[in-house]
Regions:
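C-terminal capping/lid region of NAD(P)-dependent oxidoreductase domains
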Residues: 2-4, 293-303, 311-333
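A glycine-/small-residue-rich N-terminal strand-loop-strand element
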Residues: 54, 72-95
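NAD(P)H dinucleotide-binding glycine-rich loop of Rossmann-like/cofactor-binding domains
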Residues: 93-154
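Mid-domain Rossmann-like dinucleotide-binding core that forms the NAD(H)/NADP(H) cofactor-binding site
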Residues: 128-199
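Glycine-rich cofactor phosphate-binding loops and adjacent beta1-alpha1 units
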Residues: 194-264
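C-terminal substrate-binding/catalytic core of Rossmann-like NAD(P)-dependent dehydrogenases/reductases
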Residues: 255-303
C-alpha cells in the first residue's frame, strides 16, 4: 500500500433511517494495530443486517460511522503478530461496532479474515462470510444423528440455501419452504420436498409427507413468531434453531417433546469469541470456500453494482425489489 494513501471514500451513517440517507465522504484509513489488517476492498456483499442496523441506531454508532459487515479484498497493511502476507486475497465479516466494509479500505481483526483459495472468484467469496458462517453455526447447534428429517425455511435465501446443502451432507432428509420459483433447483440439489410458504396448508402437507416420522430439527430464517409456529412440528428431543430473532419464552408446555431452543448470532463473535472459537470460525470458512472451489456448494445467483450505487442497491434489497439474488458492490480503486 502506497504510504501516501491515507484517506479513502466511504459511505457513512449519520442517523437512523433509510439506505439512501448514507453519505459518500472521505475518511482516514485506520492504521492496523497488533493482530489487525487493512483490506483494500474489491467487493462488498450486501446483507439484510446492513439495512436493519442502519435503521436501528446501534449502540456506539456516531455520525460518520461506516456500516457494512461483509467484504472481499487484498491485504494492504498488517499489524504486529499477523501471519497473513501482504497481497493475500481475503474475505471477512466485520464487527458491527467497527468501521465496516462500505469503504475503499477497511481495518479488521485478522482473526475474522478468511484466505481465499485460487480458483474462487471475488464474487463467490463475497457470498460466504455472513451467509455461509451463519449456516455453519446453525447446523453446529444440532447433533449429527443419522436418518433424520429436518426443515429449512426460506431456502431461496442465501443462508438457507447453504444450510440446506450442509444438512444434506449429514445424510438427513431435508425439507424446505421456498417460493415455487426455487423448487426445481432445490430438488436438483437433493431436497426431499419443498412447500410454498404462502400456502396456508403447507404444514399439513409436510406432516403428510413425514408420515409416522417427526422433524428432528427446524431451522428458521423468518422471525421469532414464525419460529414459534414451527415448534409443534418438531418431535421428541428435537431442536428449533432461530437464525432470525430468538424466542424469549418456551413455545411448548414443559414435559412434552423436550424441545431444545437455539439462538444463532454470528456477529456476537466479535465481542465474545475466544481464540479457539476464532480458529473454528476460520476453519469453517476455509471448508466452505474450498467447497465452492471444487463445485460442491451452490450459492445464490448474484448481480454486481457500482460503489456509487450502493445506497439504492441496499434499498432494493430492503424493499424486496431484488429477490433470490445476492447483491454485490464492486469497488474500483
Amino acid at each position: 500500500m502506497d504510504a501516501s494513501v491515507t484517506t479513502c471514500r466511504a459511505w457513512t451513517w449519520h442517523a437512523p433511517g433509510e439506505p439512501e440517507q448514507l453519505r459518500l465522504e472521505d475518511q482516514g484509513i485506520v492504521s492496523p494495530g497488533p493482530g489487525e489488517i487493512v483490506v483494500r476492498n474489491t467487493m462488498i456483499a450486501l446483507n439484510p443486517v446492513d439495512w436493519k442496523v442502519i435503521a436501528a441506531s446501534p449502540d456506539g454508532w456516531r455520525p460518520g460511522h461506516v456500516p457494512g459487515v461483509d467484504g472481499v479484498g487484498i491485504v494492504a497493511q498488517a499489524g504486529d503478530g499477523v501471519g497473513i502476507p501482504l497481497g493475500t486475497r481475503v474475505a471477512y465479516h466485520q464487527g458491527l461496532g467497527k468501521a465496516g466494509s462500505f469503504a475503499e479500505y477497511t481495518t479488521v481483526d485478522a482473526d475474522c479474515a478468511l484466505v481465499i483459495p485460487d480458483g474462487v472468484s471475488d464474487e463467490s467469496a463475497a457470498g460466504i462470510p455472513c451467509p455461509g458462517l451463519t449456516a455453519w453455526q446453525a447446523l453446529a447447534k444440532v447433533p449429527d444423528m443419522p436418518n433424520r428429517d429436518v426443515l429449512v425455511t426460506g431456502a431461496g435465501g442465501a443462508v438457507s440455501l447453504i444450510l440446506a446443502q450442509l444438512a444434506l451432507r449429514r445424510n438427513w432428509r431435508v425439507w424446505a419452504t421456498a417460493s415455487p420459483v426455487h423448487r426445481e433447483r432445490l430438488l436438483a440439489l437433493g431436497i426431499a420436498g419443498t412447500f410454498d410458504y404462502r400456502d396456508e396448508g403447507w404444514r399439513a402437507q409436510l406432516v403428510a409427507a413425514l408420515g409416522s416420522r417427526r422433524l428432528f430439527a427446524a431451522f428458521d430464517t423468518t422471525n421469532g413468531a414464525y419460529a414459534r409456529g414451527l415448534a409443534p412440528l418438531v418431535g421428541y428431543n428435537g431442536h428449533l434453531v432461530c437464525i432470525q430473532d430468538r424466542l424469549e419464552s418456551p413455545p411448548l408446555p414443559p414435559f412434552t417433546t423436550a424441545l431444545s431452543l437455539h439462538e444463532v448470532a454470528l456477529n456476537s463473535a466479535h465481542g465474545h469469541a475466544t481464540a479457539e472459537d476464532w480458529r473454528e470460525w476460520r476453519q469453517a470458512g476455509a471448508h466452505l470456500l474450498d467447497a465452492v472451489r471444487v463445485g460442491a456448494l451452490d450459492l445464490q445467483p448474484h448481480i454486481v453494482t457500482a460503489f456509487d450505487d450502493l445506497p439504492p442497491s441496499l434499498s432494493a434489497l430492503k424493499h424486496g425489489r431484488i429477490k433470490g439474488q445476492k447483491i454485490l458492490v464492486r469497488i474500483e480503486v
